[in-house]
Amino acid sequence: MPKIIDEFFTGPLLPPLLSWSGEPEDWRLTPDGLVVAPAAGTDFWQRTHYGFRVDRGPCLMTPVSGDFTIEAEVSFRPVHQYDQAGLMVRLSPDCWLKTSVEYEPDGPSRLGVVVTNNGWSDWSTQDFKGDGISLKVSRVAGDYSVHALLSGDWTQLRICHLAEDDGVRPVTAGLYACSPQGAGFQATFRRLCILT
């Protein structure tokens, strides 16, 4: 697969293929990578269990057509419950997936995948201890597989389908970070790679 993006975020500018949706007030390029500090009240979730709908947060995305794989390496300094950073693939506010580590202050954090179809989200999780992770999402014929690099091996987290994805039209894919409960969280994205 050829690479359309292979970025370590150490240069003075973001790659031209990437653009912000919900650009945060606080982001910067550093020798360690892209640092993002999302505002309080940012999140992506639709209805299920909690009853609310929220669709706002910083995403650094690019349109991608056909089959692809997107990988990212991210480290985090969480402050509040549910602080999160990872990958997102999006067709609309009612149809998307995200994978990340969500912080739990009183126990292990949650490594998981949220899949949203027809305006309803679901969340699969497993315990995670650590302050950084590599994540990967692959699209093949409109279906998705999600993996995390755990103990040196890519471990499957989820296989899913996005209802609005016909396997042909472009989706947007990239990085995201959110702070549902309060400000102060910082995520550092050390690498983003997209292969088609």
Language-model-derived ranges and their functions:
Residues M1-T196:
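Extracellular glycan-recognition regions
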